[in-house]
């Protein structure tokens, strides 16, 4: 009975959050909800549809895309293909891939990819450099200079208009961080991947509910856009924890820096199959 009660409560909460639709807290105070293609309201539709937003962002901010990669030979070429397709001013978008001591063909593939992508910078780290993923991200943070940092996993898959949606929401909404909703690309593989897909969907509903209640969402590592000055004020990425995304969420909150959720388009990643 307790399990059934909990399921009903959580299910009802998720349903009510979904039906409420629009996340008004993600919009600037003077904006008006616009409609997506399915007729529902969303903050990203409001911002993307407002010509004043595009005009005010005639000078788009510099963005650094940062990826920590260890033994990612299976996905690194696809990653760069997607990043190369992003619709954003080329002179204001830089990619940093930190080869974190890879022992497969990742280093060779990155060498082959560099001539194809002029904005690609590769940082090499020894496998025992320490700090884990956070250490790799901090290495890129120290060498880059963009106003905004987009953190992706090597298997992260984003759409070509991702930055066109992310940046207006972040800038016009006065957010210090924007987390993309996470989704799974291989959900139908087996029970384990389906469970992970369900977990990500439910987590997104919880984050949306927090925002609708006037709160903030949490950062989730893959697919997070961060303001550099706030990130640096927080001391960068914490190398002494394995839950660096949750740690950073708390440190942003302690700084008074607000974070929100981008519902569409999501960042997609591969679920663990075994």
Residue ranges of predicted features:
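A short, conserved beta-strand element in the Rossmann-like catalytic core
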Residues: 101-103, 155-158, 183-185, 225, ...
């Amino acid at each position: 009975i307790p399990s059934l009660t909990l399921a009903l409560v959580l299910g009802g909460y998720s349903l009510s959050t979904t039906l409420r639709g629009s996340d008004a807290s993600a919009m600037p105070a003077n904006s008006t909800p616009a409609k997506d293609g399915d007729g529902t309201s969303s903050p990203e539709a409001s911002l993307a549809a407002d010509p004043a937003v595009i005009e005010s962002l005639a000078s788009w901010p510099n963005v650094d895309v940062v990826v920590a990669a260890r033994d990612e030979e299976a996905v690194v070429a696809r990653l760069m293909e997607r990043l190369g397709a992003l619709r954003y001013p080329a002179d204001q978008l830089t990619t940093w891939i930190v080869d974190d001591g890879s022992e497969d063909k990742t280093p060779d593939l990155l060498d082959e990819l560099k001539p194809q992508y002029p904005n690609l910078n590769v940082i090499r780290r020894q496998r025992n450099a320490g700090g884990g993923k956070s250490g790799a991200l901090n290495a890129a943070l120290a060498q880059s200079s963009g106003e905004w940092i987009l953190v992706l996993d090597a298997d992260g898959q984003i759409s070509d208009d991702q930055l066109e949606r992310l940046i207006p929401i972040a800038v016009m909404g006065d957010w210090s961080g924007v987390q993309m909703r996470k989704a799974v690309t291989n959900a139908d593989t087996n029970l384990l991947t389906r469970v992970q897909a369900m977990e990500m969907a439910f987590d997104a509903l919880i984050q949306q509910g927090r925002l609708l209640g006037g709160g903030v969402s949490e950062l989730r590592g893959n697919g997070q856009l961060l303001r550099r000055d706030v990130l640096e004020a927080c001391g960068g990425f914490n190398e002494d924890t394995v839950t660096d995304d949750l740690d950073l969420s708390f440190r942003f909150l302690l700084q008074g820096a607000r974070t929100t959720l981008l519902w569409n388009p999501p960042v997609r990643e591969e679920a663990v199959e075994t």
